[in-house]
């Protein structure tokens, strides 16, 4: 199973910053993506957005939807549609496992990032559960409390108390 996130030697093109705020991440997967040539060139220029992106299962295949990859500015009539659906490449066992988990629970597939690994475009895909408003408030309160603890420890280390 290829469970790894974008490491430091990979060039990250786009990240979904709201995903960790709106969802509880349960598991992550690395998936390949089927792209056209102008899409790869546009990604190399960093022209992508994962805002409002999600993945769905259709006929035993996983499709990435609502990802915006801008048209390649040097492209001609061969340019791609910016928000077309793109097929994700995973092993059959991984796809079957994801389908089972999605059907069993209230889970969804959310792309966390798009990056290059050895010249190939990869998507970090997360199996996630949506957060309610009270969950978001609890996370915010927990982060504030942690920040206060760190601030207090810094003051004590400097001898200001």
Curated annotation (Swiss-Prot):
User: Which SUPFAM superfamilies is this protein grouped with?
Assistant: Small protein B (SmpB) (SSF74982)
CDD domains for this protein: SmpB
UniProt KW GTP-binding keyword: no
Choose any GO biological process term that the UniProt entry carries and state it: trans-translation
An example GO CC term for this entry is: cytosol
* Gene Ontology MF terms in the entry: RNA binding
Q: What are the record keywords, sorted? A: Cytoplasm, RNA-binding
Cell location: Cytoplasm
Sequence similarity: Belongs to the SmpB family.
> Which NCBIfam families does the record associate with it?
PRK05422.1, smpB
- Name of this chain's protein: SsrA-binding protein
Organism encoding this protein: Mycolicibacterium smegmatis (strain ATCC 700084 / mc(2)155)
The taxonomy runs: Bacteria, Bacillati, Actinomycetota, Actinomycetes, Mycobacteriales
What gene is behind this protein?
smpB
């Amino acid at each position: 199973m290829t469970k790894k996130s974008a490491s430091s030697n990979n060039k990250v093109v786009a990240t979904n910053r709201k995903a960790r705020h709106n969802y509880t991440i349960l598991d992550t997967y690395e998936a390949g993506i089927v792209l056209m040539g102008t899409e790869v060139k546009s990604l190399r220029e960093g022209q992508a957005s994962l805002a409002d992106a999600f993945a769905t299962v259709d006929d035993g295949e996983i499709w990435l939807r609502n990802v915006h990859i801008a048209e390649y500015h040097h492209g001609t009539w061969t340019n791609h549609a910016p928000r077309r659906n793109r097929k994700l490449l995973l092993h059959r066992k991984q796809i079957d496992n994801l389908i089972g988990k999605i059907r069993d629970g209230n889970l969804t597939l959310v792309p966390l990032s798009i990056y290059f690994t050895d010249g190939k475009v990869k998507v970090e895909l997360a199996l996630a559960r949506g957060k309610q408003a009270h969950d978001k408030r609890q996370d915010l309160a927990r982060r504030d409390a942690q920040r206060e603890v760190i601030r207090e420890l810094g003051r004590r280390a400097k001898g200001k108390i």
